[in-house]
């Protein structure tokens, strides 16, 4: 993180009055500390007491901020990450969601922890993203990025599809299933975990492939090197439409016969944590693991 940190962005789409209050408190505290603060312009109508020239788009915030503070749950962090990862701006989260795997700071007592971070007492880690492209007749029809996962699934609920999986152009397996979750280590505690996938330490350079309700007893999750390129060829015999969902927020339409190319993005998310952060403490706390015996 740039030191000294002069320009700070506040990002997030609040779902309730408590989250709105956190945005206000952050803005007031940071400005009182002497920082230049800009806010996600999607909040301009909600925070109408703040001068309009203190609002900017996510792209502008990414270009100009030294630090971005995301208020909300992991969903807000995922949405911000897909844009902010294009820029060299570190991100820290204030949790106003449910689990909050990616948002560390307590909204009721963020000042002390944030002050320490701004003084240089923090842990910085890089989380890689995936790029997902839909190819049709040799051309890219659509693409997007995902911090958690890219998921091939049917457009209709509870409708099986058939597809082939290639890893670095080498045929791996075919599958008749509800879909396939292609997950980063960051996403291994999200949708992938619900689908029976493994938990991957965020420092691992690996990608997991997790079948969704496969019509076979032999199908199991597969972990491959993070530099491998995944190609899914959708059967031309599939009925209806399919989709590739990026982080559950962006959907790319897929037609029978299309190819989906998934690979590691050149961009990374720079995630900032307080100095006392422990990934395994987060797992134990969020997933309800047992405490120490002695």
Curated annotation (Swiss-Prot):
Cofactors, names only: a divalent metal cation
Enzyme Commission code(s) on record: 2.7.1.23
GO process annotations (BP): NAD metabolic process; NADP biosynthetic process
GO CC terms in record: cytoplasm
Localization in the cell: Cytoplasm
InterPro entries on file: ATP-NAD_kinase_N (IPR017438), ATP-NAD_kinase_PpnK-typ_C (IPR017437), NAD/diacylglycerol_kinase_sf (IPR016064), NADK (IPR002504)
Active-site positions on this chain: 74 (proton acceptor)
Listed NCBIfam families: PRK01231.1, PRK03378.1
UniProt-recorded name of the protein: NAD kinase
Lineage: Bacteria, Pseudomonadati, Pseudomonadota, Gammaproteobacteria, Vibrionales
Gene responsible for this protein: nadK
